Every structure is written in structure tokens, then in C-alpha cells.
């Protein structure tokens, strides 16, 4: 599966315990999304277009109206990255 660099970064943050929050307008449409890391920072690479691509590829999912998290397919699609921790 072809995954772009911003999608890969977002999946990596989600695999480490992050989540995606949708922000809606008054009409109920999703206007922006925020990808939060497990440390509480916000990832700037996660845009509405990236979120829609990940959702269309079924790499992220939401259960019971909770924030979006990575699912099994997303974990299999993400490539390993080295971290300085």
C-alpha cells in the first residue's frame, strides 16, 4: 500500500499512543483535525486531507464516538522508525 510521508508520520504518532480529534462547525461538518501525541503535543503534519486519506484506507477508526486511533490495518501498514528515547 502506498502511504505518503505525512500519512506515515501521522500513523507513527498514532502507533505510539496518539489520537486524532475532529473539530466540527455549527452545521456538524468536520472543519479541522488535531493529532495529539501521547505527550500532549499537536502534530502539524496531520491535516484534514491526511485524515481523510487514512480514514478512506481504513487505517484509523473510532469506537463509540471516541477520538480516532490506529487500528490493526494501520499497525500493519506503518513502517518502523528509530526514536531518540
UniProtKB/Swiss-Prot annotation:
Q: Identify the domain of life.
A: Bacteria
Quote the Pfam families the UniProt record gives: YjhX_toxin
- Bridged cysteine pairs (disulfide): none
The UniProt entry's sequence similarity note says: Belongs to the UPF0386 family.
Instruction: Report what the protein is called.
Output: UPF0386 protein LHK_03186
Amino acid at each position: 500500500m502506498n502511504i505518503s510521508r505525512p500519512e506515515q508520520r501521522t500513523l507513527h504518532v498514532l502507533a505510539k499512543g496518539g489520537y486524532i480529534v475532529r473539530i466540527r462547525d455549527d452545521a456538524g461538518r468536520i472543519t479541522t483535525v488535531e493529532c495529539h501525541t501521547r505527550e500532549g503535543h499537536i502534530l502539524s503534519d496531520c491535516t484534514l486531507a491526511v485524515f481523510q486519506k487514512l480514514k478512506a484506507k481504513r487505517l484509523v477508526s473510532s469506537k463509540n464516538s471516541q477520538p480516532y486511533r490506529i487500528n490493526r490495518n494501520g499497525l500493519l501498514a506503518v513502517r518502523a522508525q528509530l526514536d531518540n528515547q
